[in-house]
Amino acid sequence: MRSKFDEQLKKLNEEMMHMGSMIEESIQKAIEAFIHQDADSAKAIMEGDSEIDREQKKIESLCFNLLMQQQPVARDLRTISAAMKMVTDMERIGDHAADISEMTILMSSDKPYRVNIEHVKSMASETMLMLIRAIEAYVEKNNDKAHIVMKQDDVVDELFDKVKAELIDFIREHPEDGEQAEDLLMVAKY
């Protein structure tokens, strides 16, 4: 009985890693589409969001089956509960990639970016690292990695503050490009 449960937990971990890879790819492609103002790629990312939603449902179903059929002990129950919480957050990150893509489509008809997008690119890189490390921390049950992810969130917050400050200055200096700056702030917020 326990070996079947362990197999299902292993399957859960594999599905979590798979979903993480899907989201990482979605974020990466969304940022690339944004950088290059590529509306066609952005549309494809938005269409691909439903695959992430299906993966979330698959993982939630697996968690419910583990809870109902296996009656896990405390440690295993925490693992399953953590997976259910994480998968919801992961799906939301996937939604943010779709939101960035939506903004890319809106901004793709604009003139080339006059605002600095380097901090947004850095935020995306940090976010992808956080996602990878969070999944690793979950799978490995590694509290130290989880704490690193929490600290990394502060780095992303600092980058967002820099983006905000730069955009405020940019709008003051170039009010004619204020809308583009506002749109970039929305992208950074996602």
Name these PLM-found stretches.
Residues 1-190:
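Cytosolic, long alpha-helical scaffolding segments
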